Amino acid sequence: MSHQETHGFQTEVKQLLNLMIHSLYSNKEIFLRELVSNAADAADKLRYEALTKDELYEGDGELRVRVSADSEKGTVTIEDNGIGMTRDGVIEHLGTIAKSGTAEFFKNLSGDESKDSQLIGQFGVGFYSAFIVADKVTVRTRAAGHAADEAVQWESAGEGEFTVENIVKESRGTEIILHLREEEKEFASDYRLRSIITKYSDHISVPVEMWQEGTPAQEATEEGGEAIPATEGHWKAMNKATALWTRNKSDVTDEEYQEFYKHISHDFADPLLWSHNRVEGKQEYTSLLYIPSKAPWDLWNRDRKHGLKLFVQRVFVMDDAEQFMPSYLRFVQGLIDSNDLPLNVSREILQDNKITTALRTAVTKRVLGMLEKLAKNDPEKYQTFWAEFGQVLKEGPAEDFANKEKIAGLLRFASTHTNEAAHTVSLSDYVERMKEGQSKIYYIVADSHEAAANSPHLELLRKKGIEVLLMSERIDEWLINHLSEFDGKQLHSVTRGDLELGELEDAAEKEAQEKLETESEGLVKRVKEVLGDKVAEVKVTSRLTDTPACVVAGAGEMSSQMIKLMQAAGQAVTESKPVFELNPEHPLVKRLDTEQDEEVFGQWAELLLQQAQLSEKGSLADPSAFIKLMNKMLLASVK
């Protein structure tokens, strides 16, 4: 036995241990689900490695997990004969959290125990869940293929440190011994453990065994009766030990599907919906796909691992096979079991593979179909999905041209039709309500729902009763750049150049607009002269009814929201000059037109321009100059 080393836990592990003990006390039994799940994963990994290195089995290919309790000692032991760990592996896996964004996870914790419990569940506590019920944990492990004297013992009381030393262990795999806290001794009971295994681990594909005591022989109790022979004690599987996805859908209960989801995702909450399908023919595969009910805390972390579990002919191959699911569906959990891929498939082979491409196409359509069905049959439940994952789905049109129309049908927006901030309006809803003669879908993108709903750009459209989609999420401008039409109707921004009302604008309105332009030629010329190159163009508009002026993007120019998006991404963008539109019917513009003092005229023109820019962009390059100018004009008006 080698000398013992003492190591300190990574700071995040200390925080997690403390959190679990205080936040998960109402759901303590999940420690067994997590540890049995990890043990089954270790068996799966050995089965895969042994495909090319049969010697790793060391003559024992019967993979299993064993759970036992010692009520006198107050211990629970979870043992597997899976892949095992080396000394370095033990220090890495049992002393740190190798997840990116961990610091961000801890920032998200609120102190509300029920909410934090959900977050911790999403984070995936795994091995550390042992400390929910134990005040000391001992791990004895030997990696498959290593000598007996290369085994390792890890031990910790969960208080900041752990010890590691080499030991001798004849059998491969990992043994975890939980020394239960005094108040948790209820778990040192075979009956209690058996009930938890039956509840949480029935779906696990390796046997989860517990010791069954033998029975003594019994003599015949009556004439003609048969004597009952003695039975020896033996290990007996407590679960079905068949891969859940290989069973017929009709034989699997909702509870089993839900527990299997928790097994593969390590989420504590039930999934929102799932789809289990077996496909035979040109390609043979089974998919089991889940939509979670809550977005994971690190959904927007670029380094977050995502993807499906990959099995080939029921043999586990890899986690997080992102090649089967597009990025905009990265929230989908589940697995795919292919009969056509080679067992020795690697991530590199998956990258450029016709089978992978075909499977990706099929499961993508399957997920979109699930969502279409949900949106149609249960709009309320779909709203739950949209609130959690809508922004991610909006990445779809840019990423998946083949399914652009399907994705567009799943999008939801706020709208002037509902006057609510909730995103409940689909593009199909909008098209159904379009006015006679309307050929475009009108929308506005702004910094907030309030800014969009109160934008002066909506004034004429509101007056005419034309619905406008209100967009205020950062990704919306990006979405619209890749979704130019829906159902043959072009999407048109109300903040861009001409409103293009087409048949919605009658001959009298066109005539009135032309008359206004003619009458305002002098005003337009004067304003352009005083503003100079601050604007690309000055014109009069009929789009405004209550506001004196607005700015719009010129034809072919980037909108203010797109410029903000590019700048936020760190790209240098030269801001284009806006088109400045005046409402000649507004009292302030009429006042401007009658001003003879050129200096005062220039100040009024500048004030109206900056007001319009503030309304459009939500900020100004030099707000203090704007305030000085406004104060100057206010003082002049009270003299």
UniProtKB/Swiss-Prot annotation:
It comes from the Bacteria. Homodimer. PANTHER family: HEAT SHOCK PROTEIN 90 FAMILY MEMBER (PTHR11528). Belongs to the heat shock protein 90 family. InterPro entries: HATPase_C_sf (IPR036890), Heat_shock_protein_90_CS (IPR019805), HSP90_C (IPR037196), Hsp90_fam (IPR001404), Hsp90_N (IPR020575), Ribosomal_Su5_D2-typ_SF (IPR020568). Residues 348-564 are annotated as: B. This is Chaperone protein HtpG. CDD domains: HATPase_Hsp90-like. Keywords: ATP-binding, Chaperone, Cytoplasm, Nucleotide-binding, Stress response. Molecular chaperone. Has ATPase activity. One of its GO terms (cellular component) is cytoplasm. GO terms for molecular function: ATP binding; ATP hydrolysis activity; ATP-dependent protein folding chaperone; unfolded protein binding.
